Amino acid sequence: MPKRGRVGLAESFQSKTKKQKENEYNAFQREKMERALANNARAAPKSSGMTFRPLTVPVAGSVIYSRPRVPQVRTNQMSTFVVNTELVANITLAAAGAFSFTTQPLIPSFGSWLANIADLYSKWRWISCSVVYIPKCPTSTQGSVVMAIVYDAQDTVPTTRTQVSQCYQSITFPPYAGYGGASALNHKGSGGESLVSTLDTNRVDKRWYSTIGNAAFTALTSIDKNQFCPATAIIAGDGGPAAATAVGDIFMRYDIEFIEPVNPSINV
């Protein structure tokens, strides 16, 4: 004889269809996730979009550069790839605390070594490109430096450090910062003290850019420069010592792809 009366929980669960069981399980998981998200939202502080990290520096510091291995050059049937790091600019704070800035167009002809390879190809694109600041001044040096990458050559030049600090992914730091991040010169996985601005290759306008030399690029209008240059690094500073002071070096760490070989004598 079948049992009569209330059905137990186990029997009730067993009598449900597979679809009903899946629906109940999914509903339970959704409710669990919603509770977790609600708890996280209550716990997370409001953010302005700014991040910071404290800086501790020695009384004196410096960086020794060496090149234990050659730049990496590899090829396939269609492209040539080059990986390297090279010095591209020196940064000096203007006298009497005045504002000053340096621009570094992110094109291969502005790397003195890379430019010679770029002359051999018609087109190129960055696989990755980063600008690294390495200090060369004592920790007693006063002032502030800001570094950012802008993606429109038509933008006018900055006149204040505030303007540069408002750019996408800008970094502001004292001129003596960055000793501990020298490993960023060699690879992407650098320490927390590195001062690096990295090109966002998803934001560039074109897939490929035509090769152009320094002189020809400098002579272009700002509108035309956008056809040859995906972005420009800006390094600016103010509040420096009474006399103009060299405070750091700018290195470009890159992985670049070239296509369409061409005779350098006809490459502009």
Swiss-Prot record:
Principal place of residence: virion
InterPro entries: Capsid_prot_S-dom_vir, Viral_coat
Any one GO cellular component localisation term in the record: T=3 icosahedral viral capsid
Chain segments carrying region P domain, projecting: 259-268
Subcellular location, record wording: Virion
Superkingdom of origin: Viruses
SUPFAM superfamilies per UniProt: Positive stranded ssRNA viruses
GO molecular function, one term: RNA binding
Keywords for this protein: Capsid protein, RNA-binding, T=3 icosahedral capsid protein, Virion
Function, as annotated: Capsid protein self-assembles to form an icosahedral capsid with a T=3 symmetry, about 28 nm in diameter, and consisting of 180 capsid proteins.
Sequence similarity: Belongs to the icosahedral plant coat protein family.
Self-association and partners: Homomultimer.
Protein name: Capsid protein
Source species of the chain: Tobacco necrosis virus (strain D) (TNV-D)
